[in-house]
Amino acid sequence: MKAFGGYHPAVTFTYFISVLLTAMFVWNPVIQLTALLGGIMFSLMLVRKKAVLSDMGFYLPLFLLVAVTNPLFSHNGVTPLFFMNGNPVTLEAVVYGVFISVMVVGVLFWCKCDNEIMTEDKFLYLFGRIIPKMSLVLSMALRFVPMFKRQMKNVSRAQKAMGLYSQKSYVDRLRGGIRVFTAMISWSLENSMELSSSMRARGYGLHGRTNFSLFKFGARDAAVLLSGLLLFAAVLIGVGSGSIDFTFYPELGKISLSLKSLITYISFFILSFLPFFIEVKENLKWKYYISKI
């Protein structure tokens, strides 16, 4: 189910902007771990567990790469753990590398959730009248990667059905991969030109053109939007007051547990898990109604 996707596009767009801005620019371990966990839990509600595990198979090597690379190239910090080729590998650099990895993976999970909820029609609805060309480009970019992956699988299956690169040698696989990739480049260029011509023929972006939409802003949309904005405002106040500031260099700081910082942590926790709570609530409601049939 995608219960959160049933809310007004302005609500979901504002929510994702709030979470992503916090996850990208608030350098606090508690905030980053909360964002990562919230993104994972929301992803599990939106897509199949197999797809989430597949994503983790890609994110885990990325996590390790970033976490290991930073202490090898950055030697800042006052707590050396050991020396490699005469250069110190410091505790601060290791923690900073892990922190960056958590931030990157968390943002990737939230971007995936955003891609599942904010479909191209919602972007066109929100920005089609204000910035029609930019909204068209954004909607095309959002749908490009999933379409590219689906089309690549179709082309690969079609060529395998024709008997191409059926051998198991690495050279044959490489040739087949190059052939599929070449076909995909041609397909993507042709598809973008056809879409642009189609939208132009329909009068997209012309002044005075009306749009049909099924989106209506109701009371529940107002409630979720107001709740999200209040929680985001609480996070911004906490960040602005410096209550959750955390330093990595020259030595690791301490995680603040003051009243202001706790309010900030709790506010962001509720904000990042808000769609998860909504999905769980709708699932329970659905199961309850099914049990009454």
Could you describe each region identified by the protein language model?
Residues 41-49, 117-118, 276-281:
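Structural signal for the C-terminal ends of transmembrane alpha-helices
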Residues 2-40, 154, 158-293:
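Transmembrane alpha-helix interface motif
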Residues 55-171, 284-293:
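Juxtamembrane/interface alpha-helical elements of multi-pass membrane proteins
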Residues 33, 48-57:
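Interfacial helix-loop-helix linkers and transmembrane-helix boundary segments
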Residues 27, 46-47, 74:
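Short helix-capping/hinge motifs at transmembrane helix termini and TM-loop junctions
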Residues 38-47, 62-67:
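Alpha-helical transmembrane segments and their membrane-interface exit regions
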